[in-house]
Amino acid sequence: MKDLKGTFDNPKRLKKYLSKSLFFIHHASNDLGVTFEVEMKKKYSIDTYAKLLIKELSKQLQRLYTLGARKFFVSNVSPLGCSPYIINTIIHSGPCVEEINKRVSLYNDLLPDLLEKLQSSLSGSKFVHGDIYKVFQDVFESPESYGE
């Protein structure tokens, strides 16, 4: 935002520009993957940590709204437990690390309610929820549907 503030000669023009922009938000992948595994697991239960991440996302989205942003596409987190890095790093059985996917699902389950709450409380805002978890899950479960 600092760069944008310098580009516009006054705050009203910046606010108008931001109100016409679409913001793509992808949040919490690193937090729910390696960061939780290495650092946060000792400090928080996954329920508490997921709520903490949602609270932080809420603050950041409200801050963007205050600056003038009105249109948001907010994606949830993909099934991190199926990513090659996680699969090759963490001992597990099955094709994916289900403990991590359950962790991601806890966070993802909280996201739609947050977006509905924000849209109803922030006048003129539009929040669209992108379910990339479902998209990735479909690719992992039916790779043949996407080519040979």
What are these regions (language model features)?
Residues 59-71, 107-127:
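A structural motif corresponding to the C-terminal end of an alpha-helix
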Residues 45-52, 95-105:
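A short acidic, glycine-rich active-site loop
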Residues 40, 51, 55-56, 145-147:
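Extended low-complexity acidic/polar segments
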Residues 79-98, 113, 117-120, 124-148:
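Mobile gating loops/cap/lid regions near enzyme active sites that modulate substrate access
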Residues 2-51, 63-66, 70-89:
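Oxyanion-hole/transition-state-stabilizing segment in secreted/luminal serine hydrolases
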